[in-house]
Design a protein with these regions (language model features):
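Flexible hinge/capping segments at coil-to-helix
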Residues: 167-183
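Extracytoplasmic small-molecule ligand-binding "clamshell" domains
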Residues: 59-140
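Ligand-binding cleft/hinge of the Venus flytrap
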Residues: 88-93, 104-113, 189-208, 235-239
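Extended ligand-binding regions for polar small-molecule ligands
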Residues: 50-52, 56, 101-110, 170, ...
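Short helix-initiation/N-cap motifs at beta->coil->alpha
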Residues: 117-127, 171, 189-190, 204-218, ...
């Protein structure tokens, strides 16, 4: 005896009155056919939904796993200025070198990929990362409350102080408070610009430390702010430079790597934090610090 389908069983369970007593057999067959079509359509619809859900889930996973995407591509796209010695700059052979270059290369190696460097002006670095053109910015970026609202920061990989520089014959500016009503030059949107403005200075936008020192020497600006270690490095290369350091911030700034905020960067953030911890533990960060700054800035003093 043939096994009844669910539709056939349903038709048998319905009373004859349901079919109005006319041509019951024919109407039962019509009912069975109609129900069969509806059932098949339902199965197909559910299958389609399932396929779409699976595809959406797969796409979502890919989007949410930035680290996986980077490792599949085999490259980590790093944005930096390339004109801020000793963080990132071009040596005599025009090779891109510097502390941030080597730190990011060591991190990329820990992730199992190759670094790809993209050079840009300071105020374009974050816009490029926001647009998805870069995976991260490694450019001596100081962690601030304002930046932390927009970006997720890694563990700090070095610590610096902001120093105030003036011409050697300037005895008027001795503290940050003396900047009120004065003119400084700094990269636009940098923490140095923000600090100078907070003390009442007018800031002229400039791209490189070299240009800033030239403006200072020419008397076109009254002072400038930058990382203490950047000034020390400049004086090592240019011992006769016409400027002196008169003040520096008491608390050290934390320098870290910003990533686009959100779940998409979570695995990448964890992986970079692990890499930084390992590079600090095995002495790599200390070695690179001493190579480029003449001192260890990888630990907070």
């Amino acid at each position: 005896m043939a096994r009844l389908t669910c539709v056939e069983k349903l038709s048998d369970d319905l009373p004859d009155q349901y079919f109005n007593g006319k041509d019951i057999t024919m109407k039962r067959r019509t009912f069975i056919s109609l129900m069969g079509v509806m059932a098949a359509a339902g199965v197909l619809s559910m299958t389609g939904c399932s396929s779409k859900d699976t595809a959406a889930s797969t796409a979502s996973s890919a989007t949410l796993n930035k680290l996986d995407s980077i490792q599949k591509s085999g490259k980590l796209v790093v944005a930096l200025e390339g004109a801020w010695q000793p963080w990132s700059y071009h040596d005599a052979s025009d090779t891109l070198v510097g502390y941030d270059v080597e730190v990011s290369r060591a991190i990329a190696e820990k992730l199992g990929v190759e670094p790809e460097y993209v050079e840009s002006d300071w105020d374009s670095l974050f816009a490029g990362m926001d647009a998805g053109r870069y995976d991260l910015v490694c450019n001596g970026v100081e962690v601030t409350d304002e930046r932390s609202k927009t970006y997720d920061f890694t563990t700090p990989y070095c610590y610096i102080h902001t120093a105030l520089a003036v011409k050697k014959d300037n005895d008027e500016i001795k503290t940050f408070e003396d900047l009120k009503g004065k003119t400084t030059a700094n990269s636009l949107a940098s923490t140095y610009m923000e600090l100078a403005e907070s003390y009442g200075a007018t800031v002229q936008g400039i791209d490189t430390l070299e240009e800033t020192i030239q403006l200072l020497a020419a008397g076109r600006i009254d002072a400038t702010l930058n990382a203490d270690v950047s000034f020390y490095d400049y004086l090592n290369v240019h011992p006769d430079a016409d400027f002196k350091l008169v003040a520096q911030t008491e608390d050290a700034s934390h320098v870290a790597i910003p990533l686009r905020k959100g779940e998409a960067s979570a695995t990448l953030l964890d992986a970079i934090n692990t890499a930084i911890d390992e590079l600090r533990a095995d002495g790599t960060l200390k070695e690179l610090s001493e190579k480029y700054f003449g001192q260890d800035i990888s630990a907070e003093n």
